[in-house]
Amino acid sequence: MKVKPSVKPICEKCKVIKRKGKVMVICENPKHKQKQG
């Protein structure tokens, strides 16, 4: 899980979602997981 000021999808399978008001990227590839904060 990477914590970044701006989250962007890296590949086609990356999905940008909102959980508890935080923007996150979830993906099949665990290296692509990102959280805004």
UniProtKB/Swiss-Prot annotation:
Which segments cross the bilayer?
A: none
One MF term from GO for this chain?
Answer: structural constituent of ribosome
Tell me one GO biological process term: translation
Q: Does the entry feature the keyword Ribosomal protein, yes or no?
A: yes
Q: Might you report a single GO cellular component term?
A: cytoplasm
Tell me if Kinase is a UniProt keyword of this record.
no
**Coiled-coil parts of chain:** none
The record's family statement is:
Belongs to the bacterial ribosomal protein bL36 family.
Enumerate the NCBIfam families for this protein.
rpmJ_bact (TIGR01022)
What is this protein identified as? Large ribosomal subunit protein bL36
Tell me which species this is from: Moorella thermoacetica (strain ATCC 39073 / JCM 9320)
Q: Which gene encodes it?
A: rpmJ
